[in-house]
Curated annotation (Swiss-Prot):
Residues 1-22 form the signal peptide. GO terms for molecular function: D-mannose binding. Keywords: Endoplasmic reticulum, Golgi apparatus, Membrane, Signal, Transmembrane, Transmembrane helix, Vacuole. It is found in: Membrane; Endoplasmic reticulum; Golgi apparatus; Vacuole. Residues 302-312 are cytoplasmic. This is L-type lectin-like domain-containing protein C126.08c. Residues 23-280 are extracellular. The chain crosses the membrane at residues 281-301. GO terms for biological process: endoplasmic reticulum to Golgi vesicle-mediated transport. Pfam families: Lectin_leg-like (PF03388). PROSITE patterns: L_LECTIN_LIKE. One of its GO terms (cellular component) is Golgi apparatus. CDD domains: lectin_leg-like. It comes from Schizosaccharomyces pombe (strain 972 / ATCC 24843).
Length: 312
């Protein structure tokens, strides 16, 4: 079969489109996988600080089971201007089974992570903070650990004295969040519907339990994603094992399955699916093969013409 220049060009375009479509859903700049950092102790898409310790094989420890620590990680680039979904694998644990604290937080805020008193993050932030608070300081009659959501306006401080009671716009109990196994947190932001949903699958389970749904949610024009944690007089370790983010569309909302928990459970995203670089390499190799076939066929046709000319 002869490959015309037009056919090869169309095949090349088709291959490029397929490669692009395969990558559009995955947000590499908002995802994190082992080994997390390069040999220069840096990550292209994330920055970290405070007490954060990165174990290239075992995870990112925002704090260890040590008193008076605070650590954070934050994206270098903002979240997309469209709808998106985040699935993150985390663990909260300590040697003590009775006294432990203080908690881990997930932020979608205009500020990148800076050291501060709100679970290791700066106070008076602009955006949304989701706090997994593991110790009840001044909330009698309220079960802890607990997930508490705060909408920051850039001016209002966090209500330290009452574990965020004055700031709380939604919450749910998270009694099973502490333990030896990993939890999965899933956040889904629907920009068109202005909705924000958060779910948790506890202790190795892949069955998500809805924590809250928020309506009329508008993120800051420029929004960064951050995780932070802190310990005080009590302590526990706060670990992030992996983060997977992707864009979502109206079609996804109606029929496309969400990110399956199995993609993170017991492994990291990078061990399950290739990165953009791998996809690009595969695409380039495919194009090379196509053009090699075209060149070979063109050479054969030219040789046949030369042979006929010689015979004549």
């Amino acid at each position: 079969m002869f490959f015309s220049v037009k056919n090869v060009f169309l095949l090349g375009i088709f291959g490029f489109v397929l490669g692009a479509l395969a990558e559009t859903s995955h947000l590499e700049r908002l995802s994190l996988e082992a080994p997390y950092i390069n040999h220069g102790m840096r990550n292209l898409w994330w920055e970290y600080g405070g007490s954060t310790v990165i174990d290239r094989k075992n995870g990112i420890f925002l704090t260890q089971d040590v008193q008076n620590q605070q650590g954070w990680i934050s994206t270098r680039l903002p979240t997309p201007s469209s709808s998106f979904e985040v699935l993150f694998q985390f663990r909260i644990n300590s040697e003590s089974t009775s006294l432990f604290g203080d908690g881990l937080a997930f932020f979608l805020a205009a500020e990148r992570a800076k050291p501060g008193p709100v679970f290791g993050f700066t106070d008076k932030f602009n955006g949304y903070g989701i706090f997994i608070d593991t110790y009840n300081n001044h909330r009698p009659g309220t079960l802890f650990p607990r997930v508490i959501v705060m909408k920051g306006d850039g001016h209002t401080p966090y209500d330290y004295e009452n574990d965020g009671k004055a700031n709380e716009i939604a919450s749910c109990s998270a009694l099973n969040v502490r333990g030896n196994d990993y939890n999965l947190g899933k956040l889904k932001y629907d920009k068109n519907a202005k909705k924000l949903r958060f779910e948790i699958a506890y202790q190795g389970s892949s069955s998500f339990i809805k924590c809250f749904d928020l309506n009329e949610v508008e993120l800051p024009l420029t929004t960064f994603m951050s995780f932070s944690a802190h310990t005080g007089d009590l302590s526990e370790s706060h670990e992030i094992a992996s983060i997977l983010s992707r864009t979502i569309t109206d079609i996804d909302d109606e029929g496309t399955p969400e990110i399956p928990a199995e993609e993170l459970k017991g492994t990291t995203y990078g061990q399950k699916k290739g990165s953009f670089k791998k996809r690009l390499i595969i695409l380039l190799l495919s194009l090379i093969v196509i053009f090699s076939i075209f060149a070979l066929r063109s050479y054969q046709v030219q040789q046949e013409k030369n042979r006929r000319t010689t015979v004549l």
